[in-house]
Amino acid sequence: MITIKKGLDLPIAGVPTQVINDGKSITKVALLGEEYVGMRPTMHVRVEDVVKKGQVLFADKKNPGVVFTAPVSGKVVEINRGAKRVLQSVVIAVEGEEQVTFNSYAANELVSLDRETIKTQLVDSGAWTALRTRPFSKVPAIDSETKAIFVTAMDTNPLAADAEVIINQQEEAFVAGLDLLSVLTGDKVYVCKKGGSLPRSSQKNVEEHVFDGPHPAGLAGTHMHYLYPVDTNHVAWSIGYQDVIAFGQLFLTGEIYSERIVSLAGPAVNNPRLVRTITGASLVDLTDSEVMPGEVRVISGSVLNGTQAAGPHAYLGRYHQQVSVLREGREKELFGWAVPGKNKFSVTRSFLSHLFSGQLFNMTTTTNGSDRAMVPIGNYERVLPLDMEATMLLRDLCAGDVDSAQRLGALELDEEDLGLCTYVCPGKYEYGPMLREILDTIEKEG
């Protein structure tokens, strides 16, 4: 067991009950183009085209062979683009049940398949896009290989679902997915989990590792840091546990598995719980009658690093396993810093609330102040459990110092790894976008 001591479990109200329920009926789903780092689409469909489940919607011209397929059958009703023609979303109105089918296999046949057969079916079905590289967090090239695949079979994000509850409902598919990954890498598959019992693969190159401690103990970046540190010469791949299940279902049934179980939770949710829905589901549909009255912000993903779900982005993200809802914090408070703060949370124990352990807080979207200077008071070191000089690295991100940031470990990180640093920052800096700019520059300059 690897025990993480640094970090923070955010005491936010609206914790979900760990029981799976059916979600609202979904009328629209979408693929969100901006989720795929560096992707340049070649469109295969137009508005009004009728598509089957599993049909190619667009391909990546910068990553030849990688295709993105429809998670449902229906009609393409929107293709949304932003500044510089960046693809924002391809929206499908759900209709019918037609689908593209693929080869199916018995569970005991999977480990005897060759790597090329597995890779081809994953690529053709669009399931390949569930994999992400580290460094850079991109969909891997179809001719690339890795010596390490990390399965994130736990989730320590605030308000997250318990991975064990979901995996134990799909034991056969999860093991099948692990067997496929064991062939895909030929080297090691690291299944990273919290304490508890999960179905296990019998393949010798599939290893289980237990992580314990506060968030970010459940992030792939943390697991890689301790088990297989990455750089440009040591590339690892990561995949979420629900995508491992989808891999298994694809090969066991020959059909694309689009079901996604998400945590619908937060202080502004009427009945926080786990709900069954579809990959890319409309969050307008999913949250209908689920949120409290008033102005709220719906977030696809975690409150620490998710994306605001509004307009052309109002859909469940490809890599997200939760939907969080917060009240918009627009109220101004006179001399808020001077009150005891019994109902306010502070990492630095600035408020009276730190005397009441176990208290959950109705947090909002407010930043509690305007932008200001970055102040190194030890907050970053308190929540970043990686062997890095946190303050120095974050300072380099602010300054855009590519060389120094790379030396200090920026290549090991993804935006989600800095979510807590953003949360505890007294200067209100958003470190995720700064990190992405640095990573893009490093990749561009080779």
Curated annotation (Swiss-Prot):
Q: What class of enzyme is it?
A: translocase
A Pfam family hit: NQRA_2nd
Q: Which GO terms describe its molecular function?
A: oxidoreductase activity, acting on NAD(P)H, quinone or similar compound as acceptor
Looking at the UniProt entry, the stretches that span the membrane are none
**GO BP annotations, alphabetical order:** sodium ion transport
Q: Where is the signal peptide?
A: none
Q: Which InterPro entries match?
A: NqrA, NQRA_2nd, NqrA_C_domain, NQRA_N
The catalysed reaction is: a ubiquinone + n Na(+)(in) + NADH + H(+) = a ubiquinol + n Na(+)(out) + NAD(+)
Annotated keywords: Ion transport, NAD, Sodium, Sodium transport, Translocase, Transport, Ubiquinone
Entry's EC annotation = 7.2.1.1
Indicate yes or no for the key word NAD: yes
Q: Which HAMAP family match?
A: NqrA
Spell out the family assignment given in the record's similarity comment.
Belongs to the NqrA family.
Q: What does this protein do?
A: NQR complex catalyzes the reduction of ubiquinone-1 to ubiquinol by two successive reactions, coupled with the transport of Na(+) ions from the cytoplasm to the periplasm. NqrA to NqrE are probably involved in the second step, the conversion of ubisemiquinone to ubiquinol.
| Record text on subunit structure and interactions | Composed of six subunits; NqrA, NqrB, NqrC, NqrD, NqrE and NqrF.
What is the designated name of this protein?
Na(+)-translocating NADH-quinone reductase subunit A
Organism lineage string: Bacteria, Pseudomonadati, Pseudomonadota, Gammaproteobacteria, Vibrionales
